Amino acid sequence: MANHEADKALEDRKPAGLLPPHVRAFYMRAQEDYEGFWEEAALSAKHDIHWFRKWDKVFEHNYPTFKWYVGGKTNICYSALDYKVKMGKGAKAAFISESGDTGEVKTVTYIQLLNLVKKYAAALRGIGVNKGDRIAVYMPMGIEAAGMMLACARIGAVHVVIFAGFSPRAIADRVELSGAKYVVCKARGSRRGKPIQLKEMVDDALDRLPAGHGFKHTVVLNTPEDKDIPMKAGRDMYWADFLAKAEGQNGDYVEMESNEPLFLLPTSGTTAKPKISMQCHAGYQVYVYCMGKWIYNLNASDIWFSTSDIGWIVGHSYNVYAPLLHGCTSILYEGTPDYPKNDMWYDVIERNHVTGIFTSPTGIRGLARSGVEPARKHDLSSVQRVVCAGEVLNPAAWKWFQEEVFENKIPVVDHMWQTETSGAIIGNPYGLGMAPIKPGSAAFPTPGVIADIVDEKDGRSLGVGEKGVLVITKPFPGLTPNLWGDPERYRTDYWEARPGTKGMYYAGDAAERDADGYIWFAGRADEVMKIAAHRIGTIEVENALVSHPAVVEAAVTGVPDELRGEVASAFVVLNKNFEPSDALKKELMDHVRKEMGAIIVMKDIGFIHMLPKTRSGKIMRRVIKALLTNKELGDLSTIEEEASVDEIKEAIQKIGKI
């Protein structure tokens, strides 16, 4: 890259001028001394993160992999629990666990949680678990599941949490690829009042493992009502028998070198097999703590409500670990926002005096389908801020939550990250001092994340208004340092994903930067449409559709067209006050052209009741495109409702296949 281009790229990456001066100065510290910035970040967290031994070296790069805080000794469980108890926080509530389906509420304090985790740790040792062993956890949200994660971390075992409800095939893939020899599961779960036979799904999964896998034990969390659970002698054990194994064992923590693994978390890939991202004790701990402080303003006085599940990275980072590192109270909610009532989340917020909320655009749009009336029945005045991630928070959903539900009294802040990044990489720093919110934009790279928007063909740093792809140019402490068991895929999928992005972490998102430095996402890079030579993001068209009062949710994908190369096809979920009709379809098409101009060409719009989404709430546009173009659907193990696929099929029959 020529010098003037490098200078321009640095200038474009500078933090937005709309940030307060002290925040801009903080951002620039990372630009000027990257390693020094992250060393100071770790040192500044000394009252919440404990080091048994300070690191010898801040950063070590062995492309494409890397290490942080080399030679340091820590343990995230010790920092989260033992250290907090030593600081006098033992009597404070650590977790409040609630089930929407059963109505059960349980609270555990820091000292109670520490004692519970010690017992789990001793029992794990009692069944033969050693440092470095992988433990699959297949349990619904709750204190037992979070406690098992912490117990694994405590003894140096590596937890592999699998979303409770994943299919046997998906479980088997994750157990096999991680090399887990143990599964901890619950006998049964429930969702919207329907029972889920979790243990039976685990049994099916274990039958699919290849010969020689060496699986050892399944531990089953059961209740007195679970009388008919199939158990395999010598392999399976009930919860009481598991806890009895703690006898004669100790629940002491292990001092972990900074770069020893903490957990593995599978993430979706373009192939049938998931990618197994990994995180280590030190870098992950520092990163999720700092982003919690800088972006969310997490602090010890918070009652924090993340609506995610521990099966996802948000659940790991901001249901379990970061809230405990900050010494606050975290609510673990098992269930949906609208079952058995449409005000379940609002009820949780009011009863617990929630101060901070982390949710997803899908969650907000789901609440919007019931209107603002359920919110009006509750006192939400304790809430100080809402942060949102998972997909782009479209302006209509932001406006509804910001203005209708919270009446402009608090900020609703969008931000962006991935499983592989463990925490925010793009976001408005609420904790440090915000710039104005621009609805539809996630704002700018977070402190200590050196990001750019480049042309994926030649790596050229792009200017204001030029569409390209988001890349990270330097590894940061929360970035996955490798893929478990597949370093070659790590190199090719992330650091050499495109001809122009070699040596850059390829996030896979299409984006552009505006004159104030705000980043606007257009969708996944492979979902950007090219209509008559115009590059148009699917998110842009979805935002236009959702800005119409009739539309609650929309999914858009490009489909082949002989004349224009591609045109847009859309499926929408309507507001309860509107009915499908040809007149409404035409009105929506006209509305999109009015919002976006004549360059956008819509082939058709299908009306459906639900979009195909992953269990973490992301719209599965690839499934829609595959259905439209008669392609293979691929891996559907993460889909929330299989019936949504049938809805798309029926809608396609009505509008005609492409």
Question: Residue spans of the language-model regions?
Answer:
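Conserved AMP-binding/adenylate-forming core of the ANL superfamily
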Residues: 77-78, 91, 95-149, 167-172, ...
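N-lobe entry segment of adenylate-forming
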Residues: 1-108, 112-119, 125, 206, ...
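AMP-binding/adenylate-forming catalytic core of the ANL superfamily
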Residues: 162-188, 202, 350, 357, ...
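Conserved ATP/PPi-binding loop(s) of AMP-dependent carboxylate-activating enzymes
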Residues: 444-448, 460-497, 536, 632-633
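Gly/Ser/Thr-rich phosphate-binding loop
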Residues: 237, 321, 328, 355-359, ...
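Conserved AMP-binding/adenylation subdomain of ANL enzymes
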Residues: 283-303, 313-356, 369-370
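Structural core segment of the AMP-binding/adenylate-forming
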Residues: 150, 154-241, 353, 360-361
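Conserved pre-ATP/AMP-binding loop-to-beta segment of ANL
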Residues: 91-93, 215-223, 231-266, 273, ...
